[in-house]
UniProtKB/Swiss-Prot annotation:
NAD(+) binds at residues 157-159, 191, 222-227, 243, 299-301, 345. Pathway: Amino-acid biosynthesis; L-homocysteine biosynthesis; L-homocysteine from S-adenosyl-L-homocysteine: step 1/1. Adenosylhomocysteine is a competitive inhibitor of S-adenosyl-L-methionine-dependent methyl transferase reactions; therefore adenosylhomocysteinase may play a key role in the control of methylations via regulation of the intracellular concentration of adenosylhomocysteine. It is an enzyme of class 3 (hydrolase). Its cofactor is NAD(+). It catalyses: S-adenosyl-L-homocysteine + H2O = L-homocysteine + adenosine. One of its GO terms (cellular component) is extracellular matrix. InterPro entries: Adenosylhomocyst_ase-like_sf, Adenosylhomocysteinase-like, Ado_hCys_hydrolase_NAD-bd, NAD(P)-bd_dom_sf, S-Ado-L-homoCys_hydrolase_CS. It holds the Pfam family AdoHcyase. This is Adenosylhomocysteinase.
Amino acid sequence: MTKLHYKVKDISLAAWGRKEIEIAENEMPGLMTLRKKYGPAQILKGARIAGCLHMTIQTAVLIETLTALGAQVQWSSCNIFSTQDQAAAAIAATGVPVYAWKGETEEEYNWCVEQTIVFQDGQPLNMILDDGGDLTNLVHEKYPQFLAGIKGISEETTTGVHNLYKMFKEGKLKVPAINVNDSVTKSKFDNLYGCRESLIDGIKRATDVMIAGKVAVVAGYGDVGKGCAQSLSKMGARVLVTEIDPINALQACMDGYQIVTMETAAPLSNIFVTTTGCRDIVRGEHFAVMKEDAIVCNIGHFDCEIDVAWLNANAKKDTVKPQVDRYTLANGVHIILLAEGRLVNLGCGTGHPSFVMSNSFCNQTLAQIALWTKTEEYPLGVHFLPKILDEEVARLHLDQLGAKLTTLTEKQSEYLSVPVAGPYKVDHYRY
């Protein structure tokens, strides 16, 4: 059977998608600078990158950066609801194979990911760009014959990074990987500032609820949880936080939030947001005591944080509109579930703004370049990008914000034992 060149919702959406991509490019100065810097040398020539990452307008700019640098690229989304169909169409129309549409079934999702492994000429992938680990796991488990030819994996998100470390610890990881998530210009920007804007956008588009005056509980106080708590608080909600880690819990307390258990929060809260990357955070016993029309949503990568199966088994489901379901419990109370417990900011909104994603995707691009061109520096294991590149990503975004850096004098440089051009911090500095 001949391989499809692409599969998207509607290729006629390409013109709309192209207009949005052009606007996004102006908001993604880092990626556009990397095109100018590395494009002429075609630094990724020969790379066959299989990508599994939310097929959004911002990702379209990333894809076109990779191809501008000489790579061949095939793409699927890493979530069944996160594709922006106009973005998928616009990229497919350029000849890049895209297999993604909003509202895939689980079976369709798996099919889409699998389409990215072998290219149109019959050659397999030799690089992986992943978000969450589904593509990495698929290749390791189902296509081990291709592993020897893969130079590297770059992983976008916390959940996928956990997967890489677990695989490496168990001896199952067969390809060198770069942990993009823990680059400072990713985790401290995308995870925090991105979620701070996109969480509210998703909730508002889905429900139009007034957040001011409500009680909201945020499960988890990592970078994602911090951003979510800030946004809810700034909208006027009283924010509760649940945590397992005493350090994060103390941070939340010092930021003015009350640390409670989910058992305490469940009957008090109007809005529930899970951010943990763990399973079984909101369970049946919590649903049973919730307020009328409590809004429950997740902004962690996978859909295991909220026990949706319990709701489906114990409550009557009524779909209000796509990605908004209102459940009726046996006690007559209604619960509103967003995006079927998957990423609310992408399922009900359009995800993070372009500017902050330029930070993340610069890290992805630099990781792909590093793994492709400096293979000998990345033995089997999970690595980080060097600090000097992290600083460079930040530097690429300052002009657009009108920021002017101070330059160290030679005496200051000598006094601090810090190079004038950086890096300015030791690797373990926490920011």
